[in-house]
């Protein structure tokens, strides 16, 4: 089965994260066994991004959500290694500024969406406004509970204007999160990532789980689906995300635009330049 279907949250589904194994690796027998397949998808992703850029009629928005140490940065690094930075950008959404808070919660999001021909990757996204806002009571329930429908309407508008949306929840276990926190402590190159807030947020694990489940359940639509990616194994996470993006883009059946010049004339110019050495 194609991954674009296998890990997709069907619209109307009631998600239970405890029923989804974050350590799942499909049939793959470890990282080394999957290296060739991963590289094949990376190369194909590079080709498809060039085609998206040249085609110029559509854009692609990729939203990444995860709990702390879930692998958002690693996934972005893996994808960017496959793409031409000329047509790709990454936007991270942290605590809103005073200016952003003076607008509606989607204002800063809309400004960051991709132009036609571009790929934009959101490191966290508008879903923080139904996740952290809910868990930490940043706004009352009567406010955040209305945001699911507003998010769906917002994404529907983007799709109507030819922005295709893929949303990935990188699903890790609580044990794996703690292992990654330990790895950061042990690696001087990663110690800069350490924050006391990580451990504070970890204490809200049982509150984040239902918040994610409701967002995944209510906001996975036919036109803007969520994908739940088993992410305890970083290599499988990278494989699954790359494969889904490739399968999705291939389904768009994009084509290179026709040349805008007279090729016969250009060929004559070329042969003339070659003949005369200039």
Features from the language model and the residues they span:
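NTP-dependent small-molecule kinase module
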Residues: 208-213, 217-278
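Post-Walker A helix-loop "phosphate-sensing" segment adjacent to the P-loop in P-loop NTPases
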Residues: 81-90, 253
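Glycine-rich phosphate-binding P-loop
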Residues: 63-80
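Conserved nucleotide-binding/hydrolysis micro-motifs of P-loop NTPases
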Residues: 69, 96-99, 125-128, 137, ...
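A glycine- and Lys/Arg-enriched "phosphate-lid" helix/loop adjacent to the NTP-binding pocket
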Residues: 28, 132-150, 158-210, 257-264, ...
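Conserved nucleotide-sensing/catalytic segment adjacent to the nucleotide-binding pocket
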Residues: 28-37, 86-148
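Charged, amphipathic alpha-helical linker segments immediately N-terminal to NTP-binding catalytic cores
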Residues: 1-42
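Pre-Walker A adenine-sensing motif
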Residues: 46-53
């Amino acid at each position: 089965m194609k991954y674009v279907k296998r890990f997709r949250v069907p619209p109307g589904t009631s998600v239970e994260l405890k029923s989804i194994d974050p350590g799942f690796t499909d049939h793959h027998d470890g990282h080394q066994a999957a290296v060739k397949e991963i590289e094949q998808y990376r190369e194909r992703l590079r080709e498809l991004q060039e085609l998206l850029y040249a085609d110029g009629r559509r854009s692609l928005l990729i939203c990444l959500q995860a709990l702390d140490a879930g692998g958002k940065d690693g996934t972005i690094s893996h994808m960017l290694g496959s793409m031409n930075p000329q047509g790709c950008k990454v936007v991270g959404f942290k605590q809103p500024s005073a200016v952003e808070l003076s607008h509606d919660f989607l204002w800063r999001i809309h400004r960051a969406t991709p132009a036609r021909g571009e790929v934009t990757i959101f490191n966290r996204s508008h879903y923080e406004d139904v996740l952290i806002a809910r868990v930490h009571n940043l706004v009352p329930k009567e406010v955040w509970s209305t945001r699911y429908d507003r998010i769906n309407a917002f994404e529907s508008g983007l799709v109507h204007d030819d922005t295709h949306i893929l949303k990935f929840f990188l699903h890790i276990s609580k044990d794996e999160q703690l292992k990654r926190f330990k790895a950061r402590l042990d690696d001087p190159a990663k110690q800069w990532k350490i924050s006391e807030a990580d451990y504070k947020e970890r204490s809200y694990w049982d509150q984040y789980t239902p918040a994610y489940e409701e967002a995944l359940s209510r906001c996975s639509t036919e036109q803007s689906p969520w994908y739940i990616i088993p992410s305890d194994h970083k290599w499988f996470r990278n494989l699954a995300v790359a494969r889904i993006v490739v399968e999705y883009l291939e389904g768009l059946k994009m084509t290179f635009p026709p040349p805008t010049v007279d090729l016969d004339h250009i060929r004559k110019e070329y042969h003339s330049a070659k003949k005369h050495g200039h």
